[in-house]
Amino acid sequence: MEVEESKNDASVVASPAPTKLPQKRFYRQRAHSNPIADHSFDYPIHPDDYDWSQHYPTIGDKRVEFADIGCGYGGFLVTLGEMFPDKFAVGMEIRVKVSDYVMDRIQALRKLNEGQYENIACIRTNAMKYLTNFFHKGQLEKMFFLYPDPHFKKAKHKWRIINSALLSEYSYVLRQGGLIYTITDVKDLHEWMCKHIEQHPAFERLTDDEVKADVLSEKLLDSSEEGKKVTRNKGDKFVAIFRKI
């Protein structure tokens, strides 16, 4: 069971920039964390109360527009930073050591590539509880749910990151025309996510042609560390993208 941290220990500020990329073996942690557990997090009461400049040196009066929910070790987040240098993307990760790794990774990338990767950051938080504390209504253009915890037991399905109640929150922070991207190697979870999102009145599923035309559809497959692992294990990958209407 994950040990609780004091509020100060849950700081989202990364350690001083390392001189080389961190190694994952020093940040190992269990694959998933209980989202219902009473962890301690720093979070703003209102989005206006949050100082995004602590993460993004050049953000100025701009806002974060991409959110990678459960960003893992940050592979896809880094890809977003490279593909969209003029957009600000945040990864939200509940696990302590994993979020520490992503923060240190970003700091190292910035130091090794001057002027780059200043548009991505990671925050340790529970997005299932505090998403609307960070984002205004209609703020986000894209949300990503890559290989979320499948919570296989039926009694734990209510903990899945895609459910009817949370979809209303995602709809709130997404702008009209904004997109939700999902990918998993678990067919049952894929069908669950598609069923719940398609049944929600705020969303419609993209056609196969629309998915293929999206510049990120291929990146969903192998940019993340989990995606690479599934590829190595020759597993299936199920992709679906949804638009807020």
Curated annotation (Swiss-Prot):
Q: Which SUPFAM superfamilies match?
A: S-adenosyl-L-methionine-dependent methyltransferases
Q: What is its main location?
A: nucleus
Gene Ontology CC: one annotated term: tRNA methyltransferase complex
Residues engaged in binding S-adenosyl-L-methionine: G70, E93, I94, N126, A127, L146, S224, E225, E226
Q: Where is the active site?
A: D149
User: Mind listing the UniProt keywords for this protein, alphabetically?
Assistant: Methyltransferase, Nucleus, RNA-binding, S-adenosyl-L-methionine, Transferase, tRNA processing, tRNA-binding
Q: Which reaction does it catalyse?
A: guanosine(46) in tRNA + S-adenosyl-L-methionine = N(7)-methylguanosine(46) in tRNA + S-adenosyl-L-homocysteine
Give the top-level enzyme category.
transferase
Pathway(s) served? tRNA modification; N(7)-methylguanine-tRNA biosynthesis
Q: What is its EC number?
A: 2.1.1.33
Record InterPro entries: SAM-dependent_MTases_sf, Trm8_euk, tRNA_(Gua-N-7)_MeTrfase_Trmb
On the tree of life, the source organism's domain of life is Eukaryota
Single GO MF annotation: tRNA binding
Localization annotation: Nucleus
**Protein purpose:** Catalyzes the formation of N(7)-methylguanine at position 46 (m7G46) in tRNA.
For this protein, the record's PANTHER family field holds: 3-DEOXY-D-MANNO-OCTULOSONIC-ACID TRANSFERASE/TRNA GUANINE-N 7 - -METHYLTRANSFERASE (PTHR23417), TRNA (GUANINE-N(7)-)-METHYLTRANSFERASE (PTHR23417:SF16)
Question: Can you tell me which family this protein belongs to?
Answer: Belongs to the class I-like SAM-binding methyltransferase superfamily. TrmB family.
This one is known as: tRNA (guanine-N(7)-)-methyltransferase
The record lists the organism as Aedes aegypti (Yellowfever mosquito)
